[in-house]
UniProtKB/Swiss-Prot annotation:
GO molecular function: lipid binding; lipid transfer activity
Keyword annotations of the record: Endoplasmic reticulum, Lipid transport, Lipid-binding, Membrane, Mitochondrion, Mitochondrion outer membrane, Transport
Membrane association type: Peripheral membrane protein
SMP-LTD domain boundaries: 1-256
Protein name: Mitochondrial distribution and morphology protein 12
Subunit structure of this chain's protein: Component of the ER-mitochondria encounter structure (ERMES) or MDM complex, composed of MMM1, MDM10, MDM12 and MDM34. A MMM1 homodimer associates with one molecule of MDM12 on each side in a pairwise head-to-tail manner, and the SMP-LTD domains of MMM1 and MDM12 generate a continuous hydrophobic tunnel for phospholipid trafficking.
Origin species: Candida glabrata (strain ATCC 2001 / BCRC 20586 / JCM 3761 / NBRC 0622 / NRRL Y-65 / CBS 138) (Yeast)
Similarity field: Belongs to the MDM12 family.
Gene Ontology cellular-component annotations: endoplasmic reticulum membrane; ERMES complex
């Protein structure tokens, strides 16, 4: 069963796009950068106008991992506060009882197939460091544009305790996005990577373009460094999404007051 989402409303949410920029910039600031680059910064992010295709594959009860995560959060809040109220109104802080989220009939989990080949875009700036003829001989400002992003994955979306949990499970075979680094599972549509830890890329394809001054467009050494920088950014973006979204990690949206 397929359904639509209000992509326009999502793309116009300035708080969400700001949080994405802040999250990625915090990640880039923590990276150990190679000697030929410094100061990578995401300066613009846009969801675009093309919405993803979403197909519902299964409806079930949420995984126990999500209940455990909510309970752990309650426990941490209880440790930092002398008074805490559970969802049923009991004073957990004073009684000393452990906060437990009870399973309810309204708790739901969706297994969905998420396919995106849209016009989402990212713009980054960076400084390319030329270390010849001497170290840090020159720095060149670069503008890096990323577009044509392709994703096709199975995803869990769980709702419980007024919270939504989102986690990517694995890539799905796709005639447009498949490449030589993946093999098809003969028993189903799921992609199996050649290495176990690479069961999911999340980002399967993207277009990356770098603007550099005319003076250096024909300089072989500079162009090689630009190519290395592009590969570095692509890999780190994939690593970031794996770390934040790929199971056993997830994104948690809390709708409690």
């Amino acid at each position: 069963m397929s359904f639509e989402i209000n992509w326009e409303k999502l793309s116009s949410d300035s708080d969400l796009t700001s949080n994405i920029r802040e999250g990625l910039n915090g990640y880039f600031q923590e990276l150990e950068l190679p000697s030929y680059v410094r100061a990578i910064e995401l300066v613009d992010f846009g969801f675009g106008k093309i919405a993803p295709n979403i197909t519902l594959r299964e409806i079930s009860s949420p995984l126990q991992d999500f209940y455990d995560a909510v309970n752990e959060e309650y426990e941490e809040d209880n440790e930092t506060s002398s008074e805490m109220h559970g969802r049923d109104g009991q004073n957990v802080g004073e009684s000393g009882e452990e906060a437990v989220v009870e399973k309810k009939e309204t708790d739901t989990q969706f297994l969905i197939e998420f396919e995106y080949k849209g016009d989402m875009s990212l713009t980054l700036t960076a400084e390319l460091v030329l270390n010849y003829p001497v170290e840090r001989f020159m720095t060149l400002p670069l503008k890096i544009s990323i577009s044509n992003i392709g994703l096709h994955s199975l995803c869990l979306v769980s709702y419980l305790a007024k919270q939504v949990f989102i986690s990517m499970l694995c890539d799905v075979s796709d005639p447009v996005l498949d490449d030589v680094d993946c093999v098809l599972d003969p028993n189903g549509p799921v992609l199996l990577a050649n290495k176990p830890l690479e069961r999911i890329s999340i980002i399967r394809s993207m277009k990356i373009e770098t603007e550099i001054g005319d003076r250096f467009k024909d300089d072989g050494s500079t162009l090689r460094s630009v190519g290395q920088l592009e590969e570095f950014i692509v890999q780190k973006l994939k690593d970031f999404l794996r770390k934040e979204l790929a199971w056993p990690s997830w994104v948690n949206l809390d709708f409690n007051d």
